[in-house]
Protein backbone atom coordinates (compact mmCIF):
# COMPACT_ATOMS: atom_id res chain seq x y z
CA UNK A 1 0.00 0.00 0.00
CA UNK A 2 1.20 3.52 -0.80
CA UNK A 3 0.90 5.90 2.15
CA UNK A 4 1.32 9.64 2.56
CA UNK A 5 1.98 11.47 5.83
CA UNK A 6 1.06 15.17 6.05
CA UNK A 7 2.26 17.02 9.13
CA UNK A 8 0.90 20.47 10.02
CA UNK A 9 2.82 20.97 13.28
CA UNK A 10 6.48 21.96 12.91
CA UNK A 11 7.99 21.46 16.38
CA UNK A 12 10.66 18.85 17.17
CA UNK A 13 8.26 16.40 18.85
CA UNK A 14 5.79 16.59 15.95
CA UNK A 15 8.63 15.90 13.51
CA UNK A 16 9.68 12.97 15.68
CA UNK A 17 6.08 11.68 15.69
CA UNK A 18 6.12 11.65 11.88
CA UNK A 19 9.42 9.75 11.81
CA UNK A 20 8.14 7.20 14.31
CA UNK A 21 4.91 6.62 12.39
CA UNK A 22 6.83 6.18 9.15
CA UNK A 23 9.33 3.86 10.82
CA UNK A 24 6.73 1.45 12.16
CA UNK A 25 4.51 1.51 9.10
CA UNK A 26 7.54 0.58 7.02
CA UNK A 27 8.73 -2.02 9.54
CA UNK A 28 5.48 -3.91 10.01
CA UNK A 29 3.47 -3.29 6.83
CA UNK A 30 6.12 -2.67 4.20
CA UNK A 31 4.24 0.49 3.21
CA UNK A 32 5.64 2.69 0.47
CA UNK A 33 5.51 6.48 0.79
CA UNK A 34 4.83 9.03 -1.92
CA UNK A 35 2.32 10.88 -4.07
CA UNK A 36 -0.95 9.33 -5.21
CA UNK A 37 -1.33 7.52 -1.91
CA UNK A 38 -4.16 5.14 -1.17
CA UNK A 39 -4.13 6.23 2.47
CA UNK A 40 -3.17 9.57 4.03
CA UNK A 41 -2.22 10.19 7.66
CA UNK A 42 -2.53 13.79 8.86
CA UNK A 43 -0.71 14.83 12.03
CA UNK A 44 -2.12 17.90 13.77
CA UNK A 45 -1.90 19.74 17.08
CA UNK A 46 -5.45 20.74 18.05
CA UNK A 47 -5.29 23.41 20.75
CA UNK A 48 -9.00 23.02 21.45
CA UNK A 49 -8.10 19.77 23.25
CA UNK A 50 -6.52 19.61 26.71
CA UNK A 51 -2.76 19.28 26.33
CA UNK A 52 -2.70 15.60 27.38
CA UNK A 53 -5.63 14.35 25.26
CA UNK A 54 -5.62 12.94 21.76
CA UNK A 55 -7.59 10.96 19.19
CA UNK A 56 -8.10 10.27 15.49
CA UNK A 57 -10.80 11.04 12.94
CA UNK A 58 -11.60 9.45 9.58
CA UNK A 59 -12.41 11.57 6.52
CA UNK A 60 -12.80 9.28 3.50
CA UNK A 61 -9.30 7.82 2.85
CA UNK A 62 -7.61 10.22 5.28
CA UNK A 63 -6.97 9.53 8.97
CA UNK A 64 -6.24 12.63 11.06
CA UNK A 65 -4.24 12.05 14.24
CA UNK A 66 -4.53 14.98 16.63
CA UNK A 67 -3.34 15.88 20.08
CA UNK A 68 -3.76 18.82 22.41
CA UNK A 69 0.02 19.24 22.31
CA UNK A 70 2.92 17.80 20.34
CA UNK A 71 3.51 15.40 23.22
CA UNK A 72 -0.09 14.18 23.03
CA UNK A 73 0.20 13.86 19.24
CA UNK A 74 3.16 11.51 19.70
CA UNK A 75 1.14 9.50 22.24
CA UNK A 76 -1.63 9.32 19.62
CA UNK A 77 0.80 7.80 17.11
CA UNK A 78 1.85 5.12 19.59
CA UNK A 79 -1.78 4.46 20.59
CA UNK A 80 -2.72 3.89 16.96
CA UNK A 81 0.24 1.57 16.40
CA UNK A 82 -0.76 -0.34 19.53
CA UNK A 83 -4.31 -0.70 18.17
CA UNK A 84 -2.77 -2.13 15.00
CA UNK A 85 -0.98 -4.80 17.02
CA UNK A 86 2.41 -3.37 17.98
CA UNK A 87 3.41 -4.17 21.57
CA UNK A 88 5.97 -1.77 23.03
CA UNK A 89 8.23 -2.61 25.98
CA UNK A 90 11.59 -1.62 27.45
CA UNK A 91 13.03 -4.66 25.65
CA UNK A 92 11.85 -3.48 22.24
CA UNK A 93 8.70 -4.03 20.20
CA UNK A 94 6.91 -6.93 18.55
CA UNK A 95 3.56 -7.78 16.97
CA UNK A 96 0.87 -9.34 19.14
CA UNK A 97 -1.45 -9.80 16.14
CA UNK A 98 -1.16 -9.43 12.34
CA UNK A 99 -0.49 -5.82 11.33
CA UNK A 100 -3.01 -4.81 8.66
CA UNK A 101 -3.38 -1.25 7.37
CA UNK A 102 -6.65 -2.36 5.81
CA UNK A 103 -8.19 -2.78 9.27
CA UNK A 104 -7.41 0.59 10.83
CA UNK A 105 -9.60 1.35 13.88
CA UNK A 106 -12.63 3.62 13.75
CA UNK A 107 -12.56 7.24 14.90
CA UNK A 108 -11.80 7.45 18.59
CA UNK A 109 -10.77 9.90 21.32
CA UNK A 110 -8.67 9.35 24.41
CA UNK A 111 -8.63 11.23 27.72
CA UNK A 112 -5.89 9.68 29.90
CA UNK A 113 -6.65 9.50 33.62
CA UNK A 114 -3.11 10.68 34.40
CA UNK A 115 -1.92 13.88 32.77
CA UNK A 116 1.72 12.95 33.34
CA UNK A 117 2.81 9.33 33.14
CA UNK A 118 6.40 8.33 33.78
CA UNK A 119 9.09 7.05 36.10
CA UNK A 120 11.43 8.54 38.65
CA UNK A 121 14.97 7.49 37.80
CA UNK A 122 17.63 7.74 40.51
CA UNK A 123 20.53 7.42 38.09
CA UNK A 124 22.97 6.12 40.66
CA UNK A 125 23.04 2.32 40.38
CA UNK A 126 25.48 0.08 38.50
CA UNK A 127 22.62 -1.97 37.06
CA UNK A 128 20.52 0.90 35.63
CA UNK A 129 21.06 3.44 32.86
CA UNK A 130 23.91 4.97 34.90
CA UNK A 131 26.07 2.27 33.28
CA UNK A 132 24.52 2.45 29.79
CA UNK A 133 26.45 3.85 26.84
CA UNK A 134 24.85 7.01 25.50
CA UNK A 135 23.14 5.34 22.54
CA UNK A 136 21.56 2.67 24.71
CA UNK A 137 20.42 5.22 27.32
CA UNK A 138 18.73 7.29 24.60
CA UNK A 139 16.97 4.23 23.22
CA UNK A 140 15.75 3.36 26.73
CA UNK A 141 14.12 6.80 26.94
CA UNK A 142 12.53 6.38 23.51
CA UNK A 143 11.11 3.01 24.54
CA UNK A 144 9.52 4.56 27.62
CA UNK A 145 7.85 7.13 25.36
CA UNK A 146 6.60 4.37 23.06
CA UNK A 147 4.95 2.77 26.08
CA UNK A 148 2.88 5.94 26.56
CA UNK A 149 5.04 7.73 29.13
CA UNK A 150 5.18 11.49 28.73
CA UNK A 151 7.18 12.49 31.80
CA UNK A 152 10.41 11.52 33.51
CA UNK A 153 12.26 12.60 36.64
CA UNK A 154 16.01 12.23 36.96
CA UNK A 155 17.54 12.45 40.42
CA UNK A 156 21.12 13.66 40.74
CA UNK A 157 23.02 13.18 43.96
CA UNK A 158 25.50 15.94 44.79
CA UNK A 159 28.68 15.40 42.83
CA UNK A 160 27.21 12.81 40.47
CA UNK A 161 25.61 14.75 37.62
CA UNK A 162 26.15 18.23 39.02
CA UNK A 163 28.99 19.83 41.03
CA UNK A 164 28.67 21.38 44.46
CA UNK A 165 30.81 23.16 47.02
CA UNK A 166 31.99 21.78 50.33
CA UNK A 167 33.39 24.84 52.04
CA UNK A 168 36.18 26.15 49.81
CA UNK A 169 36.39 22.88 47.87
CA UNK A 170 34.52 22.46 44.60
CA UNK A 171 33.41 18.85 44.17
CA UNK A 172 32.99 18.22 40.42
CA UNK A 173 30.32 16.14 38.72
CA UNK A 174 31.33 12.63 37.72
CA UNK A 175 31.60 11.18 41.23
CA UNK A 176 29.51 8.18 40.26
CA UNK A 177 27.86 6.07 42.98
CA UNK A 178 28.78 8.51 45.80
CA UNK A 179 32.39 8.38 44.63
CA UNK A 180 32.64 4.64 45.27
CA UNK A 181 34.24 2.32 42.74
CA UNK A 182 32.31 -0.80 41.72
CA UNK A 183 34.59 -3.23 39.90
CA UNK A 184 33.13 -5.54 37.26
CA UNK A 185 33.44 -9.15 38.55
CA UNK A 186 35.51 -11.55 36.46
CA UNK A 187 32.50 -13.56 35.36
CA UNK A 188 32.06 -14.53 31.68
CA UNK A 189 28.25 -14.51 31.80
CA UNK A 190 28.15 -11.08 33.44
CA UNK A 191 30.77 -9.72 31.04
CA UNK A 192 28.57 -10.79 28.12
CA UNK A 193 25.57 -8.96 29.57
CA UNK A 194 27.09 -5.57 30.49
CA UNK A 195 28.93 -2.86 28.60
CA UNK A 196 31.64 -2.21 31.20
CA UNK A 197 34.95 -4.03 31.41
CA UNK A 198 36.76 -2.73 34.51
CA UNK A 199 34.34 -0.63 36.57
CA UNK A 200 30.64 0.13 36.44
CA UNK A 201 30.01 3.64 35.07
CA UNK A 202 29.12 5.24 31.75
CA UNK A 203 31.12 2.91 29.46
CA UNK A 204 32.57 5.82 27.47
CA UNK A 205 34.07 7.13 30.73
CA UNK A 206 36.09 4.02 31.58
CA UNK A 207 39.06 5.25 29.55
CA UNK A 208 39.11 8.58 31.45
CA UNK A 209 38.04 7.32 34.87
CA UNK A 210 41.20 8.70 36.50
CA UNK A 211 40.87 12.15 34.85
CA UNK A 212 38.33 14.12 36.94
CA UNK A 213 38.00 17.11 34.59
CA UNK A 214 37.26 15.00 31.50
CA UNK A 215 35.02 12.70 33.52
CA UNK A 216 32.97 15.67 34.75
CA UNK A 217 32.55 17.13 31.27
CA UNK A 218 31.39 13.83 29.81
CA UNK A 219 29.00 13.13 32.71
CA UNK A 220 27.25 16.47 32.13
CA UNK A 221 27.29 15.93 28.35
CA UNK A 222 25.84 12.41 28.73
CA UNK A 223 22.92 13.50 30.92
CA UNK A 224 22.29 16.55 28.73
CA UNK A 225 22.05 14.33 25.66
CA UNK A 226 19.67 11.94 27.43
CA UNK A 227 17.56 14.94 28.45
CA UNK A 228 17.49 16.18 24.84
CA UNK A 229 16.14 12.78 23.79
CA UNK A 230 13.45 12.93 26.47
CA UNK A 231 12.40 16.41 25.31
CA UNK A 232 12.25 15.30 21.67
CA UNK A 233 10.03 12.42 22.78
CA UNK A 234 7.60 14.92 24.32
CA UNK A 235 8.41 14.27 27.96
CA UNK A 236 7.93 16.71 30.80
CA UNK A 237 11.40 16.71 32.32
CA UNK A 238 12.09 17.05 36.04
CA UNK A 239 15.49 17.08 37.71
CA UNK A 240 15.63 16.66 41.47
CA UNK A 241 18.58 17.52 43.70
CA UNK A 242 19.16 17.26 47.43
CA UNK A 243 19.53 20.19 49.79
CA UNK A 244 21.77 19.33 52.72
CA UNK A 245 20.78 20.88 56.05
CA UNK A 246 24.44 21.28 57.03
CA UNK A 247 25.33 23.26 53.89
CA UNK A 248 25.32 27.07 54.16
CA UNK A 249 22.45 28.67 52.27
CA UNK A 250 24.73 30.59 49.90
CA UNK A 251 26.39 27.35 48.80
CA UNK A 252 22.98 25.78 48.16
CA UNK A 253 21.96 28.78 46.07
CA UNK A 254 25.17 28.50 44.07
CA UNK A 255 24.52 24.80 43.46
CA UNK A 256 20.95 25.45 42.29
CA UNK A 257 22.06 28.19 39.89
CA UNK A 258 24.77 25.95 38.43
CA UNK A 259 22.29 23.09 37.94
CA UNK A 260 19.93 25.43 36.06
CA UNK A 261 22.81 26.64 33.88
CA UNK A 262 24.06 23.12 33.11
CA UNK A 263 20.65 21.67 32.24
CA UNK A 264 18.43 24.28 30.54
CA UNK A 265 16.26 21.42 29.18
CA UNK A 266 14.48 20.80 32.48
CA UNK A 267 10.88 21.90 32.98
CA UNK A 268 10.83 21.40 36.77
CA UNK A 269 13.61 21.55 39.34
CA UNK A 270 12.80 19.64 42.53
CA UNK A 271 14.59 20.48 45.76
CA UNK A 272 14.25 17.49 48.06
CA UNK A 273 15.49 16.54 51.50
CA UNK A 274 18.48 14.19 51.77
CA UNK A 275 17.87 10.48 51.44
CA UNK A 276 16.72 9.15 54.80
CA UNK A 277 15.28 12.52 55.79
CA UNK A 278 18.40 14.15 57.15
CA UNK A 279 18.38 16.36 60.23
CA UNK A 280 14.99 18.04 60.62
CA UNK A 281 15.77 19.72 63.93
CA UNK A 282 15.60 23.16 62.29
CA UNK A 283 13.01 22.97 59.49
CA UNK A 284 12.11 26.03 57.43
CA UNK A 285 8.82 27.64 58.32
CA UNK A 286 6.31 28.24 55.52
CA UNK A 287 7.17 31.96 55.22
CA UNK A 288 10.91 31.15 55.16
CA UNK A 289 10.44 28.51 52.47
CA UNK A 290 8.30 30.87 50.39
CA UNK A 291 10.91 33.61 50.72
CA UNK A 292 13.64 31.21 49.61
CA UNK A 293 11.62 30.25 46.50
CA UNK A 294 11.12 33.89 45.59
CA UNK A 295 14.82 34.63 46.01
CA UNK A 296 15.91 31.65 43.90
CA UNK A 297 13.35 31.80 41.11
CA UNK A 298 11.93 35.32 41.12
CA UNK A 299 8.60 36.56 42.35
CA UNK A 300 6.51 35.54 39.34
CA UNK A 301 7.74 31.96 39.11
CA UNK A 302 7.53 31.41 42.86
CA UNK A 303 4.02 32.84 43.11
CA UNK A 304 2.88 30.65 40.22
CA UNK A 305 4.18 27.57 42.02
CA UNK A 306 2.55 28.58 45.31
CA UNK A 307 -0.75 29.34 43.55
CA UNK A 308 -0.63 25.95 41.81
CA UNK A 309 -0.36 24.22 45.19
CA UNK A 310 -3.29 26.22 46.55
CA UNK A 311 -5.45 25.36 43.52
CA UNK A 312 -4.76 21.69 44.17
CA UNK A 313 -6.19 22.13 47.66
CA UNK A 314 -2.83 22.13 49.43
CA UNK A 315 -1.15 24.86 51.37
CA UNK A 316 2.58 24.85 50.58
CA UNK A 317 4.64 23.16 53.28
CA UNK A 318 1.51 22.52 55.33
CA UNK A 319 -0.60 19.51 56.13
CA UNK A 320 -2.65 17.92 53.36
CA UNK A 321 -6.34 18.63 54.08
CA UNK A 322 -8.59 15.59 54.31
CA UNK A 323 -10.50 16.64 51.17
CA UNK A 324 -7.32 16.11 49.13
CA UNK A 325 -7.54 12.41 49.94
CA UNK A 326 -10.95 11.99 48.30
CA UNK A 327 -11.23 10.08 45.02
CA UNK A 328 -10.48 12.30 41.99
CA UNK A 329 -13.39 13.28 39.73
CA UNK A 330 -13.77 11.44 36.41
CA UNK A 331 -11.89 13.02 33.49
CA UNK A 332 -13.67 15.74 31.54
CA UNK A 333 -14.51 14.44 28.06
CA UNK A 334 -16.96 17.20 27.10
CA UNK A 335 -14.55 18.54 24.48
CA UNK A 336 -15.15 15.38 22.42
CA UNK A 337 -18.91 15.88 22.18
Model-based region annotation:
Residues 27-29:
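A low-complexity, Ser/Thr/Gly/Pro-enriched, surface-exposed linker/loop concept
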Residues 1, 33-38, 111-113, 258-261:
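Short, surface-exposed loop and linker segments with low hydrophobicity and enrichment for Pro/Ser/Thr
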Residues 248-337:
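Active-site neighborhood of glycoside hydrolase catalytic domains
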Residues 2-4, 10-13, 17-20, 24, ...:
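Feature activates predominantly on carbohydrate-active enzymes
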Residues 31-54, 64:
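Short, well-ordered secondary-structure micro-motifs within conserved domains or adaptor modules
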Amino acid sequence: MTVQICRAATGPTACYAERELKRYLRKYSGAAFGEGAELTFRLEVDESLPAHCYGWRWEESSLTLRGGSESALLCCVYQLLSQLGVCFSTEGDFLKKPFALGSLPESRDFSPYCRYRGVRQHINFPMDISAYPLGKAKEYIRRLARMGMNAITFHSYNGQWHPYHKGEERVPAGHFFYGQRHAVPADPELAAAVDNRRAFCIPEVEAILEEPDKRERFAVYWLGQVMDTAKEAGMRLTLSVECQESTPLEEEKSMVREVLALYPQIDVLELITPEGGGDNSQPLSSPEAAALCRELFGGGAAEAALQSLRQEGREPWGEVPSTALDAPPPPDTSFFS
